[in-house]
Amino acid sequence: MHKAPESVLNALVPMVVEQTAKGERSYDIYSRLLKERVIFLVGQVEEHMANLIVAQLLFLESESPDKDIYLYINSPGGSVTAGMAIYDTMQFIKPNVSTVCIGQAASMGAFLLAGGAEGKRHCLPNSRVMIHQPLGGFQGQASDIAIHAQEILGIKNKLNTMLAEHTGQPLEVIERDTDRDNFMSATEAAEYGLVDSVIAKRS
């Protein structure tokens, strides 16, 4: 499938013009929403995206350490290490990070959704959530393959333990339910404990 060049995609980002005492000021829509403490995590979770998310989290903490941050997630998942960089920063900073699933939160996206502040994790009504075990592939000598297999198993156990803590589900239930791709509706995700509520309108 033909992929639009990045320059074209950037040109499609809406601009917002604000009137200030010093005149007009224009922002791209994401920068304007960042002023409202809204961060978007959209697409594949990878290192560059993770660095941008982490930087925004740290910036908003420095601006107002006592005000909530809102992380909107629409992601099919991606790199575990990149995702953990975001997750650890969410737990590290002082502000509560409220997570909201729009569209989908799958794999590492679902993990980050569940990692939001307790009582402040939400799904929109028609969003989808999917959990599963980490994926990995490696080629090389048999001894190196064995090392990587052990690493993946270790990551799997760690993620399952953390997911059990965030959802309140027993570890053995998490292990069973992540053995294969496990898709949930917004309501099912709330019942499972991945989020705290399904929201259709702002209160």
Curated annotation (Swiss-Prot):
Its main location: cytoplasm. Transmembrane segments: none annotated. Belongs to the peptidase S14 family. GO terms for biological process: protein quality control for misfolded or incompletely synthesized proteins. It is found in: Cytoplasm. It catalyses: Hydrolysis of proteins to small peptides in the presence of ATP and magnesium. alpha-casein is the usual test substrate. In the absence of ATP, only oligopeptides shorter than five residues are hydrolyzed (such as succinyl-Leu-Tyr-|-NHMec, and Leu-Tyr-Leu-|-Tyr-Trp, in which cleavage of the -Tyr-|-Leu- and -Tyr-|-Trp bonds also occurs). Cleaves peptides in various proteins in a process that requires ATP hydrolysis. Has a chymotrypsin-like activity. Plays a major role in the degradation of misfolded proteins. It is an enzyme of class 3 (hydrolase). The gene is clpP. GO terms for molecular function: ATP-dependent peptidase activity; ATPase binding; serine-type endopeptidase activity. It comes from Shewanella halifaxensis (strain HAW-EB4). InterPro entries: ClpP, ClpP/crotonase-like_dom_sf, ClpP/TepA, ClpP_His_AS, ClpP_Ser_AS. Pfam families: CLP_protease. The active site is at S107 (nucleophile), H132. Keywords: Cytoplasm, Hydrolase, Protease, Serine protease. GO terms for cellular component: cytoplasm; endopeptidase Clp complex. Fourteen ClpP subunits assemble into 2 heptameric rings which stack back to back to give a disk-like structure with a central cavity, resembling the structure of eukaryotic proteasomes. Its EC number is 3.4.21.92. This is ATP-dependent Clp protease proteolytic subunit.
